[in-house]
């Protein structure tokens, strides 16, 4: 009897996790459309601070949603593992989804880091250009 209760709880818990993942995936569709909007507002090769900052804003939201997805998948995996056992196909399916979600999170975080580095480089280049302009203006006034 206790075993059937555990399986019942596992199945019901699995339904809840699937519903939670549907909500998260729906949020990703909205974020994907937001990224498409940002991309359409700037040339694809636009590396301006404004363009990179806009992408960072959306990437940050995507990363938060992805972290939520990873947490949900971790909980689903734990639930399936305790309810069905680690060798069960449902447990393995959750493990695969978790691995893929974690890999996607790693990619998103790398992209965000690359954008932040590009913003920093652009900021430094702007400062250097400003200093050179000031130096040039100063040399003209000295002449």
Predicted regions and their residues:
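Residues at a specific register/face of alpha-helical coiled-coils
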Residues: 1-16, 20-143
């Amino acid at each position: 009897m206790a075993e059937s209760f555990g399986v019942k709880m596992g199945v019901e818990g699995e339904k809840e996790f699937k519903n939670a993942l549907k909500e998260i995936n729906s949020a990703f569709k909205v974020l994907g459309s937001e990224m498409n909007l940002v991309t359409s507002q700037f040339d694809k090769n636009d590396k301006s601070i404004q363009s990179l900052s806009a992408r960072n804003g959306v990437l940050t939201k995507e990363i938060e949603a992805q972290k939520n997805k990873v947490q949900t998948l971790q909980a689903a995996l734990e639930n399936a593992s305790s309810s069905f056992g680690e060798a069960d196909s449902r447990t393995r399916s959750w493990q695969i989804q978790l691995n893929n979600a974690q890999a996607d999170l790693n990619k998103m975080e790398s992209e965000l880091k690359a954008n932040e580095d590009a913003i920093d480089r652009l900021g430094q280049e702007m400062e250097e250009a400003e200093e050179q302009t000031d130096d040039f203006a100063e040399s003209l006034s000295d002449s």
